[in-house]
Amino acid sequence: MDPQIASASVLAAALAIGLAAIGPGIGQGNASGQAVEGIARQPEAEGKIRGTLLLTLAFMESLTIYGLVIALVLLFANPFAG
């Protein structure tokens, strides 16, 4: 494999996982904070808020997993390697 392609693939993999983790990380923090505030205001709605929170956290985490998959493809099954 060409050294430039190898180094670009490693850099792209690092950027893919890094950038894929930033957005969901911020979103999960905001969602969790809002859920805690909602439970503090309405303790009787705790079950519904928690269920909705867990579902949305799973959706947000899937974005990070997609970034991880792209990074692994670039590192181990590189389509640009020739």
From Swiss-Prot:
- Sorted alphabetically, which keywords does the UniProt record give? ATP synthesis, CF(0), Hydrogen ion transport, Ion transport, Lipid-binding, Membrane, Thylakoid, Transmembrane, Transmembrane helix, Transport
Does Transport count among this protein's keywords?
Answer: yes
Task: Give the CC-aspect GO terms.
Answer: plasma membrane-derived thylakoid membrane; proton-transporting ATP synthase complex; proton-transporting two-sector ATPase complex, proton-transporting domain
Q: Where in the cell is it found?
A: Cellular thylakoid membrane
Q: What CDD domains does the database record attribute to this sequence?
A: ATP-synt_Fo_c_ATPH (cd18183)
Annotated site (Reversibly protonated during proton transport), which positions?
E61
Q: InterPro entries attached here?
A: ATP_synth_csu_bac/chlpt, ATP_synth_F0_csu, ATP_synth_F0_csu_DDCD_BS, ATP_synth_F0_csu_sf, ATPase_proteolipid_c-like_dom, F/V-ATP_Csub_sf
Plastid in keyword set: no
Q: Which spans are transmembrane here?
A: 5-25, 57-77
Coiled coil stretches, renumbered: none
**Topological type in the membrane:** Multi-pass membrane protein
GO terms of molecular function: lipid binding; proton-transporting ATP synthase activity, rotational mechanism
Q: Indicate where this protein is primarily found.
A: membrane
Q: Which family does it belong to?
A: Belongs to the ATPase C chain family.
Entry's PANTHER family?
ATP SYNTHASE LIPID-BINDING PROTEIN, MITOCHONDRIAL, ATPASE PROTEIN 9
Subunit comment = F-type ATPases have 2 components, F(1) - the catalytic core - and F(0) - the membrane proton channel. F(1) has five subunits: alpha(3), beta(3), gamma(1), delta(1), epsilon(1). F(0) has four main subunits: a(1), b(1), b'(1) and c(10-14). The alpha and beta chains form an alternating ring which encloses part of the gamma chain. F(1) is attached to F(0) by a central stalk formed by the gamma and epsilon chains, while a peripheral stalk is formed by the delta, b and b' chains.
Instruction: State its role.
Output: F(1)F(0) ATP synthase produces ATP from ADP in the presence of a proton or sodium gradient. F-type ATPases consist of two structural domains, F(1) containing the extramembraneous catalytic core and F(0) containing the membrane proton channel, linked together by a central stalk and a peripheral stalk. During catalysis, ATP synthesis in the catalytic domain of F(1) is coupled via a rotary mechanism of the central stalk subunits to proton translocation. Key component of the F(0) channel; it plays a direct role in translocation across the membrane. A homomeric c-ring of between 10-14 subunits forms the central stalk rotor element with the F(1) delta and epsilon subunits.
Its recorded name reads ATP synthase subunit c
Q: Corresponding gene?
A: atpE
